[in-house]
């Protein structure tokens, strides 16, 4: 009889990072003889094509009600009770061999109902932690705010109006207690928590989830897409004629991603230097100074890889991040990275693949970039690509998950792999 894998995530769309990950894990699992099922929010993604069998959860009205409970009463993850009961009934019928949680926030699940069910069955549970929401009373990142309340107990949340925004109530103190009770209810041997960075594991070891069993599995990328390219096409398309090209990429540009820092850096550029920013909105593009070329968000990954290849240095002045994929993509295209010492952003950067500077030190970031330019990109290109081939292959990271599933089903212990091995 085939083993059954059930993954749970709010989105299924491949143009979202977690949607792509759950689909590709499912596809690889099927190649290795598993039946693959994915439960997701029908209210957010509708009925979508997928090679795995899908279990749509809730509907648009359910998402809207959950959104209202979030906006008014700070009850994110505490609505959608009926939709979650229906999901539990499907899970009971399906009897999966492994349950793999991804994001359980996203306006579609009532997490106390889900975890009461998980605590009462014997099925191994894997939980990939893509952000910090699981162990805070409200926010999904706290680095930029400099908040450490999550270590001992939240309350009077400084980020109440940020995702998942609450316009009226601050329930962060009770949310913290509710999450702690639910997320520590499973026996340690049945829940394996998978942070996507060593940094996040270190943070969780200081949270109410400190006694969990952890195994870090980094995210990977498609190395057959992100590889060194000739740059003539994008150079002409975007009129990039300067001698030295610095690149920055984000899905959304905001203060937390380093927008203000890059504007300061642009004011320091020489005439033979240009900053290219990918992911800007039309409004942001109109605001850019003349020595910054703004490119709106593109789903054309081949063009994005060409832009990575064109740049001499990739800049990532992020103030909060777990394990940014943009760093991996740049390095895979042979381009060294200069990043702030932020979260897991440093984990792909070695002396051979880039440099790390302190948060907010824009002058040091530009100096590091110029040091790389002076040394020559040729010094880094091969080392970057070799490092990517060894560490960033998405299929190898997905195999790590399949190996984890098999170990759990055999009742074997989960050994944390040395991140430097």
Residue ranges of model-derived segments:
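Conserved donor-binding/catalytic core segment of Leloir-type glycosyltransferases
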Residues: 194, 239-257, 263-266
